[in-house]
Each structure stands twice: as C-alpha cells, then as structure tokens.
C-alpha cells in the first residue's frame, strides 16, 4: 500500500509542500524582520503576518496536582503521563491493570530509492511580500489536502492485519512500521482504587478540561499561573488569514465573557 502511495507521488508531494511552507514562511519573515510595524495586513489577499512575543514557562506539576487534589479536582483535570510511567518500573507494574487499550501510529522509513523520491527542494522566488503571501496561501490549501489524504491513508494502514502481526513491512522504497503510543490510563479508577499518589506524581493537566474548569469559575487563571515560572521569552512569526485571526479573537473574548458570567453567578 505505502509503495503505491510513494509511486503515485502522494508522499513526495506532502514532503515537498511541507518544505515549501517552511521556506516561504522564512522568506516572508526575512522581509519583515527589520520593519517597525510588527503586524502587517494584506487586505487584498485577506491575510496577516505578525511577530508575536511568547513567554516560555516551567510548571511545577506536582505542586499544581497537590493543589488540584486539595480542591477535589485532580482526576477531573489530569491525565497520567504515560511516557514517565514507562520510566518507572514500580508504577508501570502497579498501574498495568488500569491501562487503556493500546493506540498505534505508523512511521515510514526510506532507503536510497525512497530518499531520492523525497529529495526535491523548493526554490522560492525573491519576490515582494504580497506575492509571497499569495504563494503561502496557495501552499496552505494544497498542504491541507495532502495532509488529509495522508492521515486517511495512515488510518487504513493501522487496520492492516499483516502490519499488526509483523509490526514492520518492507517495500521498494524502504519500510513502514507500526509503533505504540505511550500508554494512557483510567485516571478515575486509579484515583479511587490506588489513591492520589500516582496522579500527583505523574499527572499532567489536560488543557481543554482545565480551560473548562476556568470558564466555569471552579479555578482561576491566577491560581493556575501561581505554579508557572517564566524562564524565557521568544518571538514567533505567524502568517494566517484575517478570518482565522478574527476567530481566535472572538473565541478569546467569548471565553472571557463566560468566565465573567460564572463569576457573577457565584458572587
């Protein structure tokens, strides 16, 4: 199957488009890096390019998990970090009965013939920002289609009985391997039957669930931030459609309004 996917050019195209996106992104960044205005709107193309300052934080997870436990929220917010459990033989054996069904993903490897098919490098023309923005948007649409096609193809591979059995299948361009995701666990069963220790030591907040608790006013962002320490600052460069930017702003404002409404209800 993967051999046909390669031969038909689907994977090489995906690989090329990923490289092209990175190169176009870098070209636009270089054009804008010395500008005073760190946010440029391209009205005709309905796109925006901007530099965004982002803090890098270190989180005291054990301290935060203790805090969640004291508030009665720990198993509702946290998942067990399977990677860290794998490194601890005692807890790996202790929690074995609470492990969820194993999930898998596929990984391609390439021989010389496969690498030759994937080696094409994009050449980005030295054009103005407007032209590069158009190239970026064209690439984004093509890349979205290529990614969707590959994700659908991988789902089919995961169901392949031969790959499930052998875990690795060779083909003309290399091989395809089936690998296990880190284990996931039933955190409620662990909390109720084993106790909170494993969740406190190895738990990591599920950000979506944590956001829901913040929105409901059950815990504040200030409480969460108390367990974070900023260790660095970086400047990210982002290119997106104006519609996407507006949706992000709308979602943020909606979330803030929901938090305010919940605070009023509890006042």
What is each PLM-predicted segment?
Residues 1-24, 129-153:
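Amphipathic alpha-helical coiled-coil segments
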Residues 15-123, 144-267:
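Extended, charge-rich alpha-helical segments
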């Amino acid at each position: 199957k993967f051999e046909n996917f390669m031969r038909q050019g689907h994977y090489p195209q995906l690989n090329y488009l990923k490289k092209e996106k990175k190169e176009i992104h870098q070209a636009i960044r270089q054009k804008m890096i010395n500008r005073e205005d760190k946010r440029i709107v391209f009205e005709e193309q309905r796109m925006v390019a901007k530099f965004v300052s982002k803090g890098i934080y270190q989180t005291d997870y054990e301290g935060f998990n203790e805090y969640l436990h004291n508030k009665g929220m720990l198993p509702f917010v946290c998942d067990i970090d399977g990677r860290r459990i794998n490194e601890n033989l005692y807890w790996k054996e202790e929690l074995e009965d609470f492990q969820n069904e194993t999930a898998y993903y596929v990984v391609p490897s390439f021989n010389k013939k496969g690498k030759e098919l994937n080696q094409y490098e994009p050449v980005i023309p030295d054009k103005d920002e407007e032209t590069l923005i158009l190239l970026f948007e064209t690439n984004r649409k093509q890349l979205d289609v290529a990614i969707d096609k590959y994700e659908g193809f991988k789902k089919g591979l995961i169901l392949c009985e031969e790959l499930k059995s052998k875990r690795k299948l060779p083909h003309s361009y290399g091989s395809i391997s089936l690998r296990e995701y880190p284990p996931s666990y039933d955190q409620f069963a662990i909390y109720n039957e084993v106790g909170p220790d494993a969740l406190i030591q190895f738990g990591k907040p599920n950000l979506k669930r944590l956001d829901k608790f913040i929105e409901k006013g059950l815990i504040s962002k200030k409480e969460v931030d108390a367990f974070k320490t900023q260790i660095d600052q970086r400047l990210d460069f982002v290119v997106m459609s104006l519609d996407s930017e507006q949706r992000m702003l709308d979602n943020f404002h909606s979330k803030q309004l929901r938090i305010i409404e919940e605070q009023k209800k509890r006042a």
